């Protein structure tokens, strides 16, 4: 024999889940115990409706008088209608009737009627009275004792087998219940059998039911299986739970109940309590009121209309017509007695529910769902087993407004008839649907291969765009959110479309994954708003948030610029605390030389500022602190004092003061403060990270040069930030000046390193990356390397001093601007002129002859002009290399690639031009 199992009960299932043999007795006992509520919970009786007590009283009065008569009538009818062949099959080899046989639908029949041969005490112990049957009752049935023969296929409803009585004609509104509830109560493979059984029982059971009612026959225990007046006793629940757990079944519904609580109306143990279907409340009524429209499903809809298949392969989702949220809420639902599910219930439906492993590897929250609108009604307190309750997220108007501003288009225009969700059959259902249209069919390319434009949204089977679904509906309907679309070649073939294992109604959403196109870099963004560059919308504006944050390079002046402590005022030209003020005075005036024990990059903060005096002093110079700033302040006070005493007579003391002042100013001019700042902020040595143990190759050398350029660019930004007057420029002008002049600055600094380190015989890019003749040829930029080496040799021929180099390098920063000008062009011109004057002052400091000073100024400015053509050639070379980088396997760091792709084309096209001192 075989017994079909469900979640904690006996009901028809597909033949894959069967247990044979020894479990028959255990299941028979479990079923009888479940049917006996027991009188142990008096509070459960008080929780039942008033109609339940009246029904129980009538059944108790009629049970003792007419139980015997009913069983005799059933035996007579069975003997009259049973054919001789069936009687022969029912007899065993020893002549005794078989204890069990197959029912009309092929399911096992488990008889539960009391035998006439049993004593009267056994008959009085009925499940409706709350007493527990004797343990030997179930055992006797399995040992071949005489038992009641089941009814033939065309018998009335009272003699139906107990397994079918759970889902057969006694279950109200089976044909009109929602598709989700149908999948819970009976799988897709057994739904047709139950519907046929229901149609037969409706036609045949009406006459027998009227005859039984006229004769006063009570309803049997099978008819009232769902109509108990009390909850399950503790023993029954514990026994059912133990058996279910031992067999791998889930009884989550029982775990949520405490003694005395009522179960949900759609639960398998919930009592209907004899209330007519017409007066039962409709759980989906609040949903219909919330949506503002009623679904026009009629109560007399046939089973074929309500069991329509959606376009999903295999028919996994049935009866979705008019149920955009898994709810069959209609105006006539109350009168038809339909058992409905609230909108917040969402099923984990699978095409392979028999495999337990199907649930273990699923990610139920990895689907791009979105909701914008009023939230559904709150979930009920106790969910059914296999139904998961989720509280939907309400993004409200803020989410709707944000979605409307999405770069993929206005979402308000996407709410059409095709956006009502899968299988929305009526126009009212489509209008009242809450399926969000954030991801349209044309945007499927962002999340996977698009399945074409097939999809119909019309009719009862519209499944969405790209699904090849049935029904010629609106083009471009919204595709279901939870599945992968078929390949391009299989877009129109429904047989090749694999339906999702899990379908989510609109009431479930966990997170909304936003699209991340691969063309947009994840770490970098644009710097400029005026030029989109060859990559479309990709700009470099947000690059400062990752690599060059403007807040980092230009912090607010509220704390000490050296250690970050609270600043006490402006000391020696910078906003510092008292401790750093005293330290700088002693360190700058003293003759002690500080050396860093590390790599000149020690952290200087409030707690570690005394660890490394060398790095602290260097940071003071970078902040602009100089001893001359204090002297200039004194000179300013002295000048004001002289103006106040202009009316007084001249005295010998005043003449002496004027002589000291003039000599002091002349001495100050020969030792400019500007040089002290430039020496302090000059960047240190930067390594390229090149592996010199590997053989030289074009890709390796150029990749190392690009990496070195990225590292040096960061130092250039820090150096420019520390230049006097640079912070007074507009922020956009600051970033533009750095982006346009970075190549010339690096070439000029590399030429100086080559002159000081290798006497201009090689190109000293970095200590670990020095180019000789072989590497110049290997890098395929030999002509550019020759010009850079010639620039390095100019430093030796002209005998450039370190002071002249520092001033020329600072002036080179302000030597290239856009043709249209900067945002604050006037201040830029003034700042550039000040740096030119500083260069002239440095020249005049060493030379007393004006003719010699003019000649020197001419030589230095010609050297500055010679840097611009070299930088332009390197701009062209790097831009061409970036375009072919994927072909030659040359790596470009993010920041370098952004600047080369966005700013270099402006220089090459003539929108940005250098400022020359001499006519070219």
Curated annotation (Swiss-Prot):
Residues 560-632 bind DNA. Changing residue 749 to V: In prostate cancer. It comes from Homo sapiens. Changing residue 911 to R: In prostate cancer. Changing residue 750 to I: In prostate cancer. Changing residue 815 to N: In AIS and PAIS. Residues 36-167, 195-228 are annotated as: Disordered. There is a cross-link at residues 388, 521 (Glycyl lysine isopeptide (Lys-Gly) (interchain with G-Cter in SUMO)). This is Androgen receptor.
